[in-house]
Amino acid sequence: MTRNKGFTLIELMVVVAIVGILTAIAVPSYLQHVIKSNRAAAESFMLQLSNLEEQVILDMRSYVAVSANANFPNAPTAASPGLNTTVPSSVSKYYNITITLPTAANYLITATPIGSQLTGDTKCANLTLDQTGAKGISGTSSATDCW
């Protein structure tokens, strides 16, 4: 009697179960890694903006407020201080970046998550950075966990 070659239904179901378990573990872990990576890109750009603001205050004696993502002012002139930068696409796809001036001597850089980052990053939510270097968040976690 010859034996049939191939897989039995039980063997196939065991493989499907193993693949399902691995997928259930790997996909959420991967998504969290992507969220952290997007957050790190925004944080890096916020630190870059902070450095540019400090250069502007030294040159122009005033900070620059920016309310539009990717439309930061051009290079500083005598009439108009500027930051001469644009928001990288790796940041603008996931965050809106704004710079507000609560007082003449202060600025607050805010990264507000949008799209998939908004729904996936509820722990940290909005990221903030001020002129003293103080880092903050508006989510349920702590600033040290998010920064």
Please annotate each region the language model reported.
Residues 11-20, 47-50, 77-82:
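Short, charged low-complexity linear motifs
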Residues 36-40, 48-70:
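Alpha-helix exit/C-cap motif
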Residues 1-33:
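N-terminal single-pass transmembrane signal-anchor helix
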Residues 9-12, 53, 111:
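Conserved hydrophobic beta-strand within the GNAT/NAT acetyltransferase core sheet
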Residues 58-147:
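Periplasmic/extracellular, small/polar-rich flexible segments of pilin-like filament-forming proteins
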